């Protein structure tokens, strides 16, 4: 149930009846303060200006045409021409009832789209580090939300599995006579990469062999392809352990590495030349873009093929967008890549659009994100100044959570304690990131993320168990409760009900903008409203059974909404804490 959409349409029709143009925007928003009702229509200002009348006068005319019978109990004009809408308690009660009767909590499914989501993108022969965390978990929250809404989501893990370094790695593998690479673990591979690089830099004969191997690998030689595949397999097996620990839905089947697009690259360069978009410049093949200017104010040249015939990341990204539209039939493509890549992507996509590879009707969206910083405000590093491995970070999260929950539950059985520590520790790391606006940098702080108060995973997980405990104490018959009516008489009941019914609106924003922090803020607010409701509206000691059952149903919908909302974020819930 999307109340905002329902009210927007009603207000729009009333505005048109009052003389506004057909494309008028009612600007219906959730009210920021209780005294302004549940929703506010702010569109009178802009439209009144166009019509040459006072906004308040337009608002008065709109009200004569606005029929919110059975939806609103009161509609009033505030200030210069805002329309405040107060929802009818009977309307709220009816829709709470409907939400409880539905597995989807009353959330409608929009028109189904095929949506490709590009996220995570680790590199082969390197261990995942904290720099991969944001893309992986923000992208996965977007994927879960879009799938819940009924879209066909294609996860695209754009793994760095190609490039000149593979000649070096294969040459080193051969030199060490470690053809049985399947038994190597990635921890060895990290050292293996360093040793290979050292030899490459210091031993010219080795470097020459490595360069030859790149050519052989790129020409499709089966022996070198087999060695390359071993390196990819070891890496992805290790990465899968990290994905599973993070409760992320990526699997090996979602890998669409850079190498996938190699066969397309010569054809794309030839096509861009044929279309007059690419030209020869100093031996390289370049596309000049008027939209981007260099320091001299001239169109910027984007190289798509080097003098030596090699291709660049831009060429791969052009092929990648083309493939996602032509082969995967995407209606929309989302890229969870950090903000430093923005200009690079914009240039690749400008070429994609000019060449007609992806029509304007298919959005290519860069859902960029900021950096993860330490308490000193600098990029998050180990004490020695090195890159923090993701596995080490998760180990520490688990260890800290283990101490925290053991302190609070000294008598809990060990296996249950371990499960709880895992849910709290991993949940804390993920939620700390997801609850921040992705476009900004954020400070990584163990104490804040593991706190039981504030907008944190432990607080949200605890809020969920608290609602469940009400049910355990009530010893309620589920069937009897299902048949009981919902009655809303108190203000706090109405506020909680209205917020519960805004779940679909929240999902819609996350799906449209790729902003999981909006869901975190909604759930945190919901938990706070439930707390106030629980304090002021007795449930178990309510004045009669009818009121008790009605309040239990509000509690029931709160628990279901918290669980489902946290699930769209990839945060585990527990029954007891």
UniProtKB/Swiss-Prot annotation:
Catalytically driven reaction(s): tRNA(Arg) + L-arginine + ATP = L-arginyl-tRNA(Arg) + AMP + diphosphate
Pfam families cross-referenced by the UniProt entry: Arg_tRNA_synt_N, DALR_1, tRNA-synt_1d
Gene Ontology MF term list: arginine-tRNA ligase activity; ATP binding
Biological process terms in GO annotation: arginyl-tRNA aminoacylation
EC number, as in UniProt: 6.1.1.19
Keyword set includes Nucleotide-binding: yes
GO cellular component: cytoplasm
Gene3D superfamilies registered for this protein in UniProt: Arginyl tRNA synthetase N-terminal domain, HUPs, Isoleucyl-tRNA Synthetase, Domain 1
Matches recorded under HAMAP family: Arg_tRNA_synth
Oligomer status and interactors: Monomer.
Protein family (similarity comment): Belongs to the class-I aminoacyl-tRNA synthetase family.
Name under which the protein is recorded: Arginine--tRNA ligase
């Amino acid at each position: 149930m999307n109340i905002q959409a329902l009210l927007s349409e009603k207000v729009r029709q009333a505005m048109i009846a009052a003389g506004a143009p057909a494309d008028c925007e009612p600007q219906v928003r959730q009210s920021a303060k209780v005294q302004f009702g549940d929703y506010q229509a702010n569109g009178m200002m802009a439209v009144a200006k166009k019509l040459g009348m006072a906004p308040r006068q337009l608002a008065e005319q709109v009200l004569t045409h606005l029929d919110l019978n059975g939806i609103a109990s009161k509609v009033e004009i505030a200030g210069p021409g805002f329309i405040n809408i107060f929802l009818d308690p009977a309307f709220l009660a009816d829709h709470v009832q409907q939400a409880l009767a539905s597995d989807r909590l009353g959330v409608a499914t929009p028109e189904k789209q095929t949506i490709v989501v590009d996220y995570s993108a680790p590199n082969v022969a390197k261990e995942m580090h904290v720099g991969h965390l944001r893309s992986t978990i923000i992208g996965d929250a977007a994927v879960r939300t879009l799938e819940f809404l009924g879209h066909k989501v294609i996860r695209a893990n754009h793994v760095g599995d190609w490039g000149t370094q593979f000649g070096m790695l294969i040459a080193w593998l051969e030199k060490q006579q470690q053809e049985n690479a399947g038994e190597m673990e990635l921890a060895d591979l990290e050292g293996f990469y360093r040793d290979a690089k050292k030899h490459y830099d210091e031993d010219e004969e080795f470097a020459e062999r490595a360069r030859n191997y790149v050519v052989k690998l790129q020409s499709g030689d089966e022996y070198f392809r087999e060695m390359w595949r071993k390196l990819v397999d070891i890496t992805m097996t290790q990465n899968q352990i990290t994905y599973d620990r993070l409760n992320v839905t990526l699997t090996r089947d979602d890998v669409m590495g850079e190498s996938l697009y190699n066969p397309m690259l010569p054809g794309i360069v030839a096509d861009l030349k044929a279309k007059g978009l690419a030209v020869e410049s100093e031996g390289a093949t370049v596309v000049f873009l008027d939209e981007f200017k260099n320091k001299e104010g001239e169109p910027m040249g984007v190289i798509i093929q080097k003098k030596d015939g090699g291709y660049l990341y831009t060429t791969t990204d052009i092929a990648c967008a083309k493939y996602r539209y032509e082969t995967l039939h995407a209606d929309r493509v989302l890229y969870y890549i950090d903000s430093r890549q923005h200009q690079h992507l914009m240039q690749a996509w400008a070429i994609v659009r000019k060449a007609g590879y992806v029509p304007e009707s298919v959005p290519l969206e860069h859902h960029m994100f900021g950096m993860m910083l330490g308490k000193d405000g600098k990029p998050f590093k180990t004490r020695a100044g090195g890159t923090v491995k993701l596995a080490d970070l998760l180990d520490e999260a688990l260890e800290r959570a283990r101490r925290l929950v053991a302190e609070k539950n000294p008598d809990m059985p060990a296996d249950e304690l371990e499960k709880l520590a895992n849910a709290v520790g991993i949940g804390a790391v993920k939620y700390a990131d997801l609850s921040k606006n992705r476009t900004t940098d954020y400070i990584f702080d163990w104490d804040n993320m593991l706190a039981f108060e504030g907008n944190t995973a432990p607080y949200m997980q605890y809020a969920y168990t608290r609602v469940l405990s009400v049910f355990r104490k009530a010893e309620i018959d589920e069937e009897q409760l299902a048949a009981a009516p919902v009655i809303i008489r108190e203000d706090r009941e109405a506020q909680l009900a209205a917020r519960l019914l805004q779940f679909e609106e929240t999902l819609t924003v996350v799906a449209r903008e790729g902003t999981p922090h909006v869901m975190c803020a909604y759930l945190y607010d919901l938990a706070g409203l439930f707390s106030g409701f629980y304090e002021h509206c007795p449930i178990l000691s309510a004045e009669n059974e009818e009121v008790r059952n009605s309040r239990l149903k509000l509690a029931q919908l709160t628990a279901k909404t918290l669980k489902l909302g946290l699930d769209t974020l990839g945060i585990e819930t527990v029954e007891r804490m």
